[in-house]
């Protein structure tokens, strides 16, 4: 099958002025799964969308609801899958895809030693402006650091919403990070109110 991917937020081809552009992890996981099935995966070009036979399936991901969307009504694809917080906060990847890591070849600007992922999902807080509790629920374990740091990638960008709220699981993962000698970017920051002496000691070694 021929698979077309669309990053509605328009980030897959942009990197200028030294800005950090993060890969769309969900589309990366979808790409890896289809590649494992022997399918051909590529970024969909706008002109190709008018040919309904060009792709067997199109996946469109929209992270932000303020991103300018695409009017898919002008296209007549039988298999169009739309996902991401910008479309539906409750739609999730199938389990067998969600457990995979992104196909990093899809994002040529990502350094060969970088990996992206989350150790936890959810958050115990209910900030009125945040979609996370509605989308992911209460804080819980999600992945092990060794699942994320694949292919010799030693610089891991963790996009957890509130990792320190995960208690013993967070401490276990921090110790693993230390033991593995990984460099970590806690990309979504941390809740300073949760930093205990034990956490401080672990974080000081990361």
List the predicted regions and their residue ranges.
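N-terminal pre-triad scaffold of radical SAM enzymes
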Residues: 4-23, 105-136, 153-160, 164
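A short, structured N-terminal alpha-helical element that caps or precedes a catalytic domain
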Residues: 1-79, 88
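Ser/Thr/Gly-rich flexible loops in soluble cytosolic domains mediating phosphotransfer, phosphorylation
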Residues: 79-107
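Conserved SAM/AdoMet-binding glycine-rich loop
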Residues: 149-206
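Flexible, charged surface loops at secondary-structure boundaries
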Residues: 49-56, 74-77, 110-111, 148-153, ...
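Ankyrin repeat (ANK) tandem alpha-helical domains that serve as protein-protein interaction scaffolds
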Residues: 95-96, 107, 114, 124, ...
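A cross-family glycoside hydrolase active-site/sugar-binding cleft signature
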Residues: 6, 44, 61, 83-85, ...
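Structural preference for beta-strand elements that scaffold enzyme active sites
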Residues: 57, 79, 114-116, 155-157, ...
């Amino acid at each position: 099958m021929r698979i077309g991917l669309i990053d509605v937020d328009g980030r897959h081809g942009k990197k200028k002025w030294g800005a950090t552009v993060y890969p769309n992890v969900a589309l990366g996981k979808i790409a890896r799964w289809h590649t494992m099935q022997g399918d051909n995966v590529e970024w969909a070009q706008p002109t190709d969308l008018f040919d309904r036979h060009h792709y067997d399936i199109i996946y469109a991901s929209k992270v932000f609801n303020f991103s300018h969307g695409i009017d898919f009504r002008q296209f007549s694809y039988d298999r169009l899958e739309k996902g991401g917080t910008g479309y539906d906060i409750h739609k999730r990847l199938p389990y067998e895809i969600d457990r995979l890591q992104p196909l990093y070849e899809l994002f040529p600007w990502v350094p060969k030693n970088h990996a992206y992922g989350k150790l936890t999902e959810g958050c115990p807080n209910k900030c009125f402006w945040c979609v996370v509790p509605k989308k992911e629920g209460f804080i819980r374990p999600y992945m092990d650091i060794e699942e994320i740091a694949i292919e010799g990638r030693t610089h891991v960008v963790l996009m957890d919403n509130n990792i320190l709220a995960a208690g013993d699981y967070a401490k276990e993962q921090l110790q693993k990070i230390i033991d593995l000698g990984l460099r970590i970017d806690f990309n979504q920051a941390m809740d300073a109110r949760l930093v205990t002496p034990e956490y401080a000691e672990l974080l000081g070694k990361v």
